[in-house]
Amino acid sequence: MRRVIILGSTGSIGVQALDVIRANPDRFEVVGLGAGRNRELALAQAAEFAVEHVSFGADDAEQLVRTVEADVVLNGITGSVGLGPTLAVLETEATLALANKESLIVGGALVKDRVRPGQLVPVDSEHSAIAQALRAGSSHEVRRLVLTASGGPFRGRSRDSLADVTPREALAHPTWDMGLVITTNSATLVNKGLEVIEAHLLFDVPYDRIAVTVHPQSIVHSMVEFVDGSTVAQASPPNMRLPISLGLDWPHRVAGVGEPLDWTTASTWTFEPLDTEAFPAVELAKAVGVSGGTWPAVFNAANEQAVMAFHAGRIGYLDILDTVTEVVDRHDGGEVTLAGVLGAEAWARRTADEVIAALA
């Protein structure tokens, strides 16, 4: 029986994790829940799963993971506010099932220096796919990682045609049902850029050996290319419960968590090169990742500010990446300490607001 704490229990990842646990009461026991503002749902979850320990907010989440003994903590918090809880989990003996990619991206060395071998299991579908595929060979046999992207709702459109995109259009993701910021990030492909940085940090593969290909069907979730020319991919119908279940009990699989592909029905899988002119976010993220230090934290914070300004009607769609680029260009770098990262984030948000005000 795995004792589980779920942070972000009322969000998409948390709700689906509870679906997995509900269907497998013989394998998992919920011992703690962490939520944000949705107190009503969190308390209902606590009642259903007989959970005594419930926290609200990131600070309380840190205290929760330090005081409640668990085998695995699923961090499904959205945004860089999840960094503190991530670091708190790494102080314990629990496995960290990480869906909060931002905490790894902005924390960088802060996280890597604290994590024990095998303690961190990725929950993002792409990185879960890579982790599964990497079991087919040794690390020195890996030629490159290939992350797949659906292309978002604006695949195939030119940059000029995106100038008048509305917030409603940006939230129409073709595959996944997610929150406001991450869905917008999927439209701009900032999310894929963040995933490139995450892949580098998780798997210690250089940026020049991490590629992105557009795969509109979202069946192949990512691939590992080996030195002998073979490619190992993980494929399944889109279903976040699969990587969530692996995160909860890695490396073991949970039977029945998802439906398999139907190999008796004709289907077509396509792969396309990424249009970096229309979607420059991935290349910008790679440059930010290579720079290291506090640049990823600045990139992420500036983007969060710009996305919220876009949805508030203060700037246009193309202004999101223009704002992020301007803020990144102004940054002088900084030391990767907790204070340094938090300071860089605060600076990035202030600077982004200045850029946004000039655009408005």
Locations of the language-model features?
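Catalytic, metal-anchored helix/loop core of enzyme active sites in primary metabolism
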Residues: 1-360
